[in-house]
Amino acid sequence: VGPPAPEELKLLEPFRGQVPDDVFGEPYMPPVSDGSGQDRALLRKAVQLLNDAGYIVKDGKRLLPNGEPFKLEFLVDEPSLQPHHAPYIKNLGTLGIEASLRVVDPVQYRARVEDFDFDMTIERFSMSATPGDGMRPFFSSQSAATKGSYNLAGIASPAIDALIEKIIGADNRADLTVACRAFDRVFRAGRYWVPQWYRTTHPIAYWDQFGHPAKPPRYAQGVGAPENWWSDPNKAAKAEQAK
């Protein structure tokens, strides 16, 4: 929160004019709706932003600056994802944007995604608790030009490339934190991803034969942090009897 600290500014200043101005002020925060699915205040703001950018409405249809209709296709491989997209598509329609959902089989989906042949799609990515060279496949300019990479948004930013290298080359935790915060400001200001939905719980099934820490590590990996479980002999004996 707040403007960049002096240490962050040192990393960001070389890219002033190449990144959005809000990188140097309060960090960008995605809008928060009223939860109704049709937040009129946000829709009015969206209309204003589109109009200001030259995306006008004619005969009820939103047009691109070149006069062509504004069309947007969401590509998914699971019919079960349709309810998650329906409110988004409905609101885009309210704005005059011709949005649609295309469900394809997993093979075709994977082929199209790896070839970057889509307008928008949904993905869930897991990141390391300590950022490092694993960021390149997701955010670097090189990965944007590599078919099959995780950089589905096609992020190609010299500023992001440089900050990734600062993160990888950090000599200590303090420098790593500064570089990550600078990266976060640039990434968020780019509006590359749209947060969509999440589940507050993940159901898993297992025999009651394990011990668990009273408080799981904050950034533990995996559902329920199974790498922090241990076999409890007493529980295991009871579970074996129940099998």
Give each language-model segment a name.
Residues 88-99:
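Short alpha-helix C-terminal cap/hinge motif
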Residues 101-111:
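Short helix-initiation/N-cap motifs at beta->coil->alpha
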Residues 1-30, 44-47, 79-90, 110-243:
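Detector for C-terminal structural segments
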Residues 68-78, 99-102, 119:
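Short, well-ordered beta-strand elements
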Residues 58-64, 100-103, 175, 179, ...:
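Surface-exposed patches in mature extracellular/periplasmic domains of secreted proteins
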Residues 34-35:
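The substrate-binding groove and active-site-proximal loops of carbohydrate-active enzymes
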Residues 43-73:
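Immediate post-signal peptide segment of exported/extracytoplasmic ligand-binding proteins
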